């Protein structure tokens, strides 16, 4: 499958798994936004700490604005391979195109580690 238009860098599987784990921890001990509308609002308001975007969103235009918006607001973002994987990590029974960690809770150190690795990938 060709890479979607909004995917700007490749994320190693281990790092994507760590990001999904951080989302699960934040969901239980902090606060997360689920769905592209909620995520867009969290980014626009500058309250998102980390944005997670699924790589298999169809049509791509649903989330194509998120990387640009996140960069503009200086909020780190990462890609997760599938909507189903992202939805499960967000505590949903269905897939989701995007999710954001708003309050890290116990995932704070893990999020810092992920952000450092994402910055290296973007270089």
From Swiss-Prot:
What keywords does the record list, in alphabetical order?
Answer: Cytoplasm, Ribonucleoprotein, Ribosomal protein, RNA-binding, rRNA-binding, tRNA processing
Q: Name one GO molecular function term.
A: rRNA binding
Q: Which Gene3D superfamilies match?
A: 3.30.1330.30
Q: Which GO terms describe its biological process?
A: translation; tRNA 5'-leader removal
Top-level taxonomic group: Archaea
Q: Where in the cell is it found?
A: Cytoplasm
Q: Which residues form a coiled coil?
A: none
Q: Which SUPFAM superfamilies match?
A: L30e-like
Its chief place of residence is cytoplasm
**What GO CC terms are in its UniProt record?**
cytoplasm; ribonucleoprotein complex; ribosome
Biological role = Multifunctional RNA-binding protein that recognizes the K-turn motif in ribosomal RNA, the RNA component of RNase P, box H/ACA, box C/D and box C'/D' sRNAs.
HAMAP family for the chain: Ribosomal_eL8
| Family of this protein | Belongs to the eukaryotic ribosomal protein eL8 family.
Share what the entry says about its subunit structure, partners included.
Part of the 50S ribosomal subunit. Probably part of the RNase P complex.
| The name this protein goes by in its record | Large ribosomal subunit protein eL8
Native species of this protein?
A: Methanothermobacter thermautotrophicus (strain ATCC 29096 / DSM 1053 / JCM 10044 / NBRC 100330 / Delta H)
